[in-house]
Amino acid sequence: RQMKRLFFIAVAAFAAVLTLSSCKASREADPDFWLGADISWVTEMEASGHKFYGRSGEEMECTALMKDLGLNAVRLRVWVDPSAHGDWCNKEDLLVKCLRAKNLGMAIMVDFHYSDWWADPAKQNIPSSWSGHSYEQMKEDLAAHTIEVLQYLKDNGVDPKWIQVGNETRNGFLWSVKSNEFGWPELDENGNTTIIESMGHAERNPEQYAGLFAAGYDACKSVFPESIVMVHLDNGFDQELYDWNLGVLQAGGARWDMIGMSLYPYWAMDGGFRDDAETTITDCIANIRHVSEKFGCDVMIVETGFLVDESDPEVLEEGRRQLARVIRESINETGGRCKGVFYWEPECKPSQYKLGAFTEDGCPTVIMDAFSDWSE
């Protein structure tokens, strides 16, 4: 975030330009680089009887274990009305996890999905209680939900450092696809989803996408004026995606304070976007430099993950090495513009999610060592 100490006049001129940028100038730089994890699943896992263990085999609460492993921040998602899915990740469940992090002195990122369940590039289903609303009504819905959740946290002593307006919004957010009874998208004969409501779809309704995002940004600032409000896209290696999507927001008058990226080399290769993990990481680091310069703001890798196979030490060691590289180059190769790296759901069982970083019985694998030995 800080420029080099030389060329003070150039820095001042550049700062003046930034005030005109879509990326709102951030407050005084925090000197820390943040190492974090999204552990939103933890309370649901605990309720099923799952336990977590430290390096020495002692049972530990998951948030405390993350801190013990060298992390200083957590990321936690929130859904609008997940009552059909056990009420996990509602505002009350969010508060439980936030208080654990707060009491450990860890920074908190809140990830608004603006859906009753999962929101990602394949689906951004409009909450059931908002369905059929007009654009103006939906801006009010979004703002009211955002303020309700954040005020609830504030009233309980929680002050999130970062707030995401949407989750992986490459195609915008608040647009619905035809889904089955379990909430998963139904695919047609060609393997495609069918969009049934396109309110905030970035390609179909770009102005509405920007307007909805702006409503979320303003709502965040109304409760926590000093919070860092983020736009979050997937495929951090894809410069063209970021130029297009952020350009849509910029053209629509939306603002943000920081750009969040997802980086999953495994999925990049699985989807045929890149041939190998090393190129994926290289392209992501280059994109961090690119978007931070083009849009004048800092960046975070808010999701990453690597293949875990506790029966194959070589796979685990490769994951540790790749994560260490991501952290190291985010610190050393981005001109100070990348401010953190967060692992997505490392505590998950491999049988539940194969890009976690723990064993089936709740012990951290060597992948987690990267958070403490990334410089080696």
Where are these regions (language model features)?
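Hydrophobic faces of well-ordered beta-strands that scaffold small-molecule active sites
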Residues: 35-39, 74-76, 108-112, 161-165, ...
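Positively charged n-region of N-terminal signal peptides that target proteins for export
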Residues: 1-7
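Substrate-binding cleft and catalytic face of glycoside hydrolase catalytic domains
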Residues: 64-205, 209-228, 234
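C-terminal motif of bacterial Sec signal peptides marking the signal peptidase cleavage site
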Residues: 19-22
